[in-house]
Amino acid sequence: MKKLTLYISACISLFAGAAVAEDQIEEVVVLGEVLFQDQINSLKTPTPVINVPQSVVVVSSEEITRRGFTSIGDIVNHVPGLNTSQGEGHRDAVVFRGVRSTADFFLDGFRDDVQYYRPLYNLEQVEVLKGPNALLFGRGGTGGVINRVTKKGSLGENFTDLGAAADTFGGVSLQIDRNMSANETSAFRVNAHYESLENHRDFFDGDQIGFNPTAKFKLSEATVLDLSYEYIDQERFIDRGIPTGTDGRPVRALRETVFGDPLLNTTELEANLFKALVQHRFSDGIKGNLSVFYGDYDKLYQNFYAAKYNQAETPNEVTLDGYVDTTQRENFQISGNVITEFQTANATHTLLFGVEFIDTASDQDRFNTYFDTSESDKETFSISEGLPLALVGGRGTNSEGQATVNDFTLKLNDDTHVEIEARSMYLQDEIQLSEKFIAVVGARYDEFDIKVNNVKSADIRNRKDGEVSPRAGLIYKPQENTSIYLSYSESFLPRSGEQFANINGDKNQLDPDTFENLELGIKWNVNEALSLSASVFEIDKKSPQVADSDPSTLDVIESSIDGFEVQIQGQLNAKWSINASYGYLDGEQVNRSGNTGLRPRELPENTISLWTSYQLTPKFGLGLGASYQDESFINNSNSATLPSYTRIDAAAYYEVSEDLMIQLHVENVSDRVYFPNAHSTHQASVGEEVNARLSVQWTL
């Protein structure tokens, strides 16, 4: 508590220091216009995208609606350099430039690392920042991050937006966005949604609810307060896909079979999220903010999945494994920063200074399956093509015809209680050297203190890491609408991992993994409505130490990922819009003996995304798109492969009036069988069959 008090004091002192400085900046040239026109929430500074020495993609709420996106995965599939992982059927999982993550998600800049499917109903925009960059986000972000920016109260406006949708699988959704402003100094906004989930796979169903009231208060001409509470309630069936065969590829003949229990393969989440943000303008050249977040998460997931399948010897049998896992996590975060703009000699500086404190308490336990017939966590069942396995509610018949019962309470695998204190301080300077050159330099210091109490093994481990993460970039602007940049940045990941279930290594002496990103890119705003960007990059992962007696540290200790990305998006003319991208990825794994000659998992060499729409009349438009993903390896041993695929989607839009829009989206028009992602060797996801979604947006 003493440390927390110190950090709260440090955050507040930022404002006090800035207030004192206000009386000392009379000699500074006032350049404050740009200070109050923030472009990207997660950058912390009001820098136009074209002046950011990093690959950045911003997806607005309008585009989310127009494209019919319903999940983070939908967005990721259209961002070059990114692809989805399966997430075991209960969480968002993204592969950022070859680096898989289930934790590098942020909500209005706050760390949002619990594993779940994040909703889109209350978002202003989604920001994707590629490449490790600890200066902005601290630990993790080893391949990039996704930041969701929520809608906030709008002063002086009153409106109600309604949305409803239904699809051919039987799923429905309802949504409301209501803003109420009684005067020019206060506004209240409520976003809420309900969604009933269905898809093409047997037994899959679920529902999710989101409720997000917010309030905005203009306390003075210089100070604004935003308050937010969000409630999330989710439940859905877990489907971990189908096995791979002798050729290492998903067995197409098994695509109608669900390898799980129709009653027990389920995940539940309940979350309560509180946020407060104070923004204050000290002068035309100095502004600051103080933000606080508290999140209370209660997560459960239990499942059976295919753990072993031998197509050559026993093609009609599969071995199932499983577990039930619970997580209760409380996450408190407080951060503050000050941005000041000033001149020295012939240079203009935008200086960012900030501090952050995170206090996390996480209780996690896992019980493995235990079958009475095998007296272990695994049991073998017969497969009948197109029919469900003989397992319902934990009871069934094994491949030998014996009645078998599973018990989720007998075999404790893990029971851990984790406490984390993370403290950070960062400083960055954006320097306008001349009309054509901008330099960005900065660094962040993170102190990560973790205590893991493993109740099962009666083992308590402690570890404290202190890491400095630099960032540097140089931008050349041959003209105002074009930038060429070279950048270097770093991040790190403690050996406790992204979900910090344990501390690997003997005597807790292993230093964090480090990630380095070197990137060269170009951004060109062709006009106000059309932009082009391209970049080449290299990400190197380094594990400085291994522990001979700890198998978890002896797998792949280093990797190198190289890539190229290009994207064009915007309006070709008043009627025709386009969003097209191409990504190329290559990489190698390195172990203690050197280059293994193996390619990292989930690293498709080529990915292509195209979406174009054309307004045939002032009221009617059509859209058409295609997504291509090259084959990729499911595992690091390169023994299992996801085949390449191409998916074609289409859409139609009809504007009934200025206040009413009807949209039809058709996914997988050619009804192609494809496998978009996987979690491990015998868990390949089956892509959705052709389906249509009709939606209506109505403004009152």
Name every feature range the model reports, one short phrase each.
Residues K436, V536-D540, D555-S637, S670-V673, ...:
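Gram-negative outer-membrane beta-barrel transporters
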Residues F274-D296, D321-N453, Q571, N579:
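Face-selective signature of the C-terminal outer-membrane beta-barrel domain
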Residues L277-N303, K477, S483-Y485, D511-V590, ...:
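Membrane-embedded beta-barrel scaffold of Gram-negative outer-membrane proteins
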Residues K218-S220, R329, T348-T350, E356-T360, ...:
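Structural signature of Gram-negative outer-membrane beta-barrels, strongest in the C-terminal barrel
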Residues E195-N199, F211-R281, Y294-R329, S374-N413, ...:
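Acidic/polar loop-and-plug regions of large Gram-negative outer-membrane beta-barrel proteins
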Residues D630-N635, Y653-L700:
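C-terminal beta-signal and adjacent terminal beta-strands/loops
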Residues D23-E157, L520:
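Acidic, small-polar-rich N-terminal luminal/periplasmic segments of exported/outer-membrane proteins
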Residues Y121-E124, L135-P213, L219-T223:
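Outer-membrane beta-barrel translocator/receptor signature
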